[in-house]
């Protein structure tokens, strides 16, 4: 049971994080280039996303949208909800990284004939991502832990299975113990990998 639940948690979590990263890159680019109108939309999105719980967002998608004729499976609601929440955190992480890149580098790239898009993807973003590694890893861990609320929309994630074992067999210590172990198995390698990457990037001249 825990293996299947872990697979579901990882699959939905990974997809949500991938989309959150894409949203974060796009939104941080909008803020970096101060694009009119869009930057205000991004600001509203970031504030809305960061100041509402994931469970409320999931309830809106799973229970609210059907009221207007839009029905999504629970898995899709989980992915979209996690991407919506994570996108705002990734936006702030990338924005902080972008601010560390010296303006002269952008100006030099543009003077060499590179387009703004080429400058962003080839010059600015790689440096920003390197500096943002600690924040990005922290966000990934945070978002994977947030998947524990998926049981609220009937997704058979790790928390759902633990609740089932407690409710059906009254094995509270065993269920909670397995839950802790499962999350450690998932999250600890990510934390270690993040530490290794941070050290290597620091030795390479990125970060502080």
Role assignments for model-derived ranges:
Residues 1-208:
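Transmembrane alpha-helices and adjacent helix-loop boundaries
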């Amino acid at each position: 049971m825990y293996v299947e639940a872990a697979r579901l948690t990882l699959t939905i979590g990974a997809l949500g994080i991938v989309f959150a990263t894409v949203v974060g890159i796009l939104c941080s680019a909008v803020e970096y280039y101060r694009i009119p109108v869009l930057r205000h939309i991004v600001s509203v999105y970031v504030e809305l996303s960061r100041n509402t719980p994931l469970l409320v967002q999931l309830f809106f998608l799973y229970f609210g949208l059907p009221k207007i004729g839009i029905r999504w499976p629970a898995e899709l609601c989980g992915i979209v909800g996690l991407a919506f929440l994570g996108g705002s955190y990734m936006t702030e992480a990338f924005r902080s990284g972008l601010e560390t890149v010296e303006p002269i580098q952008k100006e030099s790239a543009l003077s060499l004939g590179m387009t703004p898009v080429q400058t962003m993807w080839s010059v600015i973003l790689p440096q920003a991502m390197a500096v943002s590694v600690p924040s990005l890893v922290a966000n990934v861990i945070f978002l994977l832990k947030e998947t524990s609320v998926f049981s609220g929309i009937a997704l058979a994630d790790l928390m759902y299975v633990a609740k089932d074992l407690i409710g059906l067999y009254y094995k509270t210590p065993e269920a909670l113990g397995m839950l802790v172990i499962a999350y450690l198995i998932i999250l600890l390698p990510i934390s270690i990998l993040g530490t290794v990457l941070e050290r290597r990037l620091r030795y390479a001249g990125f970060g502080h």
